[in-house]
Amino acid sequence: MVRKVNIIKGNEGQGKRIKFVQLIFVDINGMPKGMEVPITRLEEAIEEGIAFDGSSVPGFQGIEDSDLVFKADPSTYVEVPWDNVARVYGYIYKDGKPYEADPRGVLRRTLERLEKLGIKVYIGPEPEFYLFKKNGSWELEIPDVGGYFDILTLDKAKDIKREIAEYMPYFGLTPEVLHHEVGKAQHEIDFRHDEALKTADNIVSFKYIVKAVAEMHGLYATFMPKPIYGMPGNGMHLHISLWKDGENIFKGEEGLSETALYFIGGLLKHAKALAAVTNPTVNSYKRLVPGYEAPVYISWGYKNRSALIRVPAFWGNGARIEYRCPDPSANSYLAFAAILMAGLDGIKHKIEPFAYVEENVYEMDEKRREEIGIDMLPENLGEALDELERDKVVKEALGGAYRNFVGYKRKEWEEYLDYLEAKNLPKDTKNVTEWELERYFFI
């Protein structure tokens, strides 16, 4: 079976002796969890599954009923180039059936629903991250003072980015663009779009690679949405297109198709509820403030980076939409499922997109925004969860994970409010607290 898996992934003959394989899934937060087993158990992991206790996995089962089974997906098998270990993603089962709260399973079921309509989904993410020096405290130290697109001496992390890019193909990712971002020590490596499930896997793999390479160089990498007050946050813009019979159905004769516009309409309608899933942490809303190119206003436009939804200047089979509010703290499987069902609702009910803008939304006064019908995203996680609980479409998109997700996030929000009260801090503070750093720095 190991040889068969190697042939599937094109890894046969690398001369490495793989002794262990990591069985990887994600918890309700999108954090990778799993276990290592001897490589001799890989066939068992694929055919029968490996049992584990789900009671200590955030957002999974209670201690009274916690027996779960991991079944490996052999198409995801890769060998870690810097270690004699392999990795494989998979699905969670309970009592012989797919576990309803398994985030990867939630996305698979969403995609199966779209496949019945003949639709395939392609998504290209743009996850941003910071690199920090290790100093044993939360006084974050930056290793470079580069700025946006700086490529010469100011960007001291260029060798690290190149090393990350060199490792990415081993995990099935194709790097396309490496560049310094706006913030000091902030970076972005874009990789090629792929089918939605593969892209969700790729995001988990990308974070793993970035953190591992940073560690090799004595640095920390963080995908935390807003690690430092006053500096740009980490976003994860998503480029989305739908395909049918080998054709991009977002492609119109002049710009976007009617289908694409209805998809945008669905996203705009459900944007407030979606925020709970695409921006699922307390810290996410420290990023979503005016002045840092992070979208705050629910609007759309062509080439307009101040809008929530931007239509890039690519036509034909390159036609797509860019959803700009997500950040890397999102569980990519749940976020993709929610976004796709919101967009599908727009297509199904022919929801016309509203709040079209050509000007900079941040420079508009309140009266002008009201004239156009521009609303705002939630201002904090608590508000976002309120919106989610009122939105039937997004709730149903999360399937069996919904109750666990909301319960976990409500508790998270309440713990944050308790911290603010104990520290005598205002509820609406935009400062990044030590509570957030301790909770989110390693996401």
Swiss-Prot record:
Broad class of where this protein is predominantly found: cytoplasm
Q: Which residues form the GS beta-grasp domain?
A: 16-97
InterPro entries (alphabetical): Gln_synt_N, Gln_synt_N_sf, Gln_synth/guanido_kin_cat_dom, Gln_synth_cat_dom, Gln_synth_gly_rich_site, Gln_synth_I, Gln_synth_N_conserv_site
Cellular component (GO) terms are:
cytoplasm
Q: Name one GO molecular function term.
A: glutamine synthetase activity
Q: According to the lineage, what is the superkingdom?
A: Archaea
Keywords from the named record? ATP-binding, Cytoplasm, Ligase, Magnesium, Metal-binding, Nucleotide-binding
UniProt KW Ligase keyword:
yes
Instruction: Report the gene name.
Output: glnA
Which SMART domains does this UniProt record tie to the protein? Answer: Gln-synt_C
Question: Which residues does the UniProt record annotate as the domain GS catalytic?
Answer: 103-443
Q: What is this protein called?
A: Glutamine synthetase
Where, in this chain's numbering, is ATP bound? Answer: E176, H239, I240, S241, R305, R310
* Membrane-traversing stretches: none
